[in-house]
Amino acid sequence: MLQLNGKDVKWKKDTGTIQDLLASYQLENKIVIVERNKEIIGKERYHEVELCDRDVIEIVHFVGGG
């Protein structure tokens, strides 16, 4: 179980990375900021940071408009 943007989410994989999580929400090609347990994770680390049970993840993505 993860907490994603304030909501409990069942993560279907035993293991996975932030990159896997972004792909599952079709955000891998978007400009996002990811925070894991109050630490901002740089994009260059998305493929190596493993998700753990009870991680608290915040994903912020930007939407254009005017």
From Swiss-Prot:
Domain of life: Bacteria
Modified positions (1-thioglycine) in chain numbering: 66
Gene3D superfamilies assigned: 3.10.20.30
Any matching Pfam family: ThiS
Alphabetized UniProt keyword annotations: Nucleotide-binding, Phosphoprotein, Thiamine biosynthesis
Modification sites for Glycyl adenylate: 66
GO molecular function: nucleotide binding; sulfur carrier activity
Post-translational modification: C-terminal thiocarboxylation occurs in 2 steps, it is first acyl-adenylated (-COAMP) by ThiF, then thiocarboxylated (-COSH) by ThiI.
BP terms from Gene Ontology: thiamine biosynthetic process; thiamine diphosphate biosynthetic process; thiazole biosynthetic process
Gene Ontology terms: cellular component: adenylyltransferase complex
InterPro entries referenced in this protein's UniProt entry, alphabetically: Beta-grasp_dom_sf, Mopterin_synth/thiamin_S_b, Thi_S, ThiS/MoaD-like
Pathway assignment: Cofactor biosynthesis; thiamine diphosphate biosynthesis
Family membership: Belongs to the sulfur carrier protein ThiS family.
Role summary: Is the sulfur donor in the synthesis of the thiazole phosphate moiety of thiamine phosphate.
Subunit structure and binding partners: Forms heterodimers with ThiG.
Protein name, UniProt field: Sulfur carrier protein ThiS
Organism lineage: Bacteria, Bacillati, Bacillota, Bacilli, Bacillales
